[in-house]
Amino acid sequence: MPDIAIIGGGAAGFFAAVNAKITYPQTTVTIFEKSNRVLAKVLISGGGRCNLTNSFAQVKDLKHVYPRGDKLIKRLFKVFDHHDTYRWFEEQGVPLVTQDDERIFPKSQRATSIADCLIRKALQSGVKIRTGYTLERLTPLPDSRIKATFRSGTTAVFNKVIIATGGSPRAEKLSYLADLGHTIVAPVPSLFTFEVREPLFRALMGTVTDPVTLSIPTTKHRSTGALLITHWGISGPATLKLSSYAARYINEQHYCFNVAVNWLNETNAETVRERLLTLAATHPKKQLNSIRPDNLSARVWQYLLQKASLDSGKPWAELGRKGLHKLVETLTNDIYLITGKGVFRDEFVTCGGVGLDCIHLQTLESKVCPNLFFAGEVLDIDAVTGGFNLQAAWTTGFVAGSTYHSATPADK
């Protein structure tokens, strides 16, 4: 009886295992997890609620949510996409809900609903689950099977192996794959918050401005969304998206770089100037601090007036050309020095991993080691926050799990 090993007991690993067993019921499928707990990352996703996918209703181009791997994801979505994910979990008895921001959660609002579903389905299907197994080496055999050697000294031979170990902060952890001839793209963090040390700015802790545009001067990296100011610096969708889009650049800068905030999400400074002139003409006797652009809170507006060296008690009619210029510059190109990175809700996402040039794109099988497949974040695929990383796990897990025969070269 053919044996299939799944290395990694996370979302991609479980989905690969379940679908391998469903597609090939006569096989023996075993999940090997290095820790003593499976699906740990699923349990903390979405703040413990598990943002398992997204409706993609607001996604015009996959590259906007998958900075790396968008073309592969687009190809694989023809096999298993977010609609299939929604249907699959509801068919397993897990009702789902779509929020106004298009993120999808279990109706229970509990990540355990997703984890319990996967474990239950795996056990019902006959998948074996083994914890405390750390893979050290893979050895291709002459008969096309693969021998796995674990840290404990245990060895086993499999007809098919699926690597679903997730993202790794260090390339050395993937050295056993490099030894087989795979290209390993150096992993770097790709979802994190930014540290800003300016005390007056951090005094705005708890305020949200939506939308803003963030950009990194002298680069093409930019993002749009809500900006949350924290005791540490900045967070929120705009920050997290920029951290993903510019992950490698930011790493090369050792997490010390400038960010420009466009508080009005308007790229044309002249348009902002006209908006302010309209406010001045409409409310000439009103104080600057009493009339503000719609998306700015009173606290943020007061701070920006102060940063522009303007007297907040001055009437709009007395703003003047110099004051107008300072205010436009502050609103559209407000520069902050970022001095470090934080984490996002204890979630750790990396860009990097097994290079996509090493795999058959239709099946996720290795080009250098037949019957070795990959699923999830171990591949050089990553996404912005919003359920997109887990969707990549379900999609790649399904494809890797339900494919058995060796791939053909038709991957162009």
Predicted segments with their positions:
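Beta1/beta-strand and adjacent pyrophosphate-binding region of the FAD-binding site
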Residues: 1-12
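Glycine-rich FAD pyrophosphate-binding loop
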Residues: 5, 21-47
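Redox-cofactor binding/interface segments in oxidoreductases and associated redox assembly factors
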Residues: 7, 44, 163-167, 374
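N-terminal glycine-rich dinucleotide-binding loop that anchors FAD/FMN and/or NAD(P) in oxidoreductases
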Residues: 43-73
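Short beta-strand to alpha-helix junction loop
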Residues: 73-81, 100-120, 164, 168-172, ...
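A conserved FAD-binding loop/helix module that cradles the flavin
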Residues: 164-180, 380-409
